[in-house]
A protein has these predicted regions:
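C-terminal substrate-binding/active-site "lid" region of AdoMet-derived donor-dependent transferases
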Residues: 93-182
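SAM cofactor-binding core of SAM-dependent methyltransferases
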Residues: 1-67
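Short, flexible loop segments at the rims of nucleotide/cofactor-binding pockets, characterized by
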Residues: 8-12, 78-84, 104-109
């Protein structure tokens, strides 16, 4: 299902880089990636052909271990600010482009917050998008469903179709999801 959605995408945002990044750029889909591990981001970027329509954004969320997971998870004001940067970075980057991704892959850190903020940003801009949350099954994602409704499932992934019918996501819900990450 993901490959079908990606092949239909005109613009693609992903939280977390890896194989999907390489596939998207090889398909020629304009891709914006947010990564929390600068070393992994560098390794992925080396595998992307020069001139590919790709932008890699590395968010400084503090010290990380494997998979870009924060070493320290107790929410403090400074950590919450850094973690919020990861969630907001792609939208801060694209706000003047007039482009909004029609496909968002949430496969990195702060998944609840990233899904909710992606939906919120689409609502603010009055556009539709599809949010694909990988590894959804077996995890606690009730805050996402509270605002976005029950997802369509594709294996262990969840697909949320965001449009005019979607309940408006308040900033406070995104903030709570970031705070509850730890």
């Amino acid at each position: 299902m993901f490959m079908q959605l990606l092949s239909e995408a005109r613009s693609y945002l992903e939280y977390g880089s890896g194989g999907s990044t390489i596939v998207a750029t090889r398909m020629g889909v304009p891709t914006l990636t947010v990564e929390s591990d600068r070393f992994f981001a560098r390794a992925v970027t080396k595998q992307i052909a020069p001139g590919s329509p790709h932008t890699m954004l590395v968010a400084d969320i503090g010290m990380t271990r494997e998979w870009g997971v924060p070493v320290f998870k107790t929410p403090t004001p400074s950590r919450l600010k850094r973690w919020r940067t990861y969630v907001d970075l792609p939208f801060d980057t694209m706000k003047n482009d007039g482009i909004f991704p029609d496909l968002v892959l949430v496969d990195g850190r702060f998944r609840r917050a990233c899904a909710l903020e992606s939906a919120r940003q689409a609502q603010v801009r009055g556009v539709s998008t599809t949010i694909f949350v990988d590894d959804y099954q077996g995890r606690s994602y009730d805050p996402i469903e509270e605002y976005l409704g029950k997802p369509e499932m594709a294996g262990v992934a969840a697909i949320f179709r965001i449009g005019p019918h979607t309940t408006t996501v308040p900033v406070s819900a995104v903030d709570a999801a970031i705070h509850d990450y730890g």
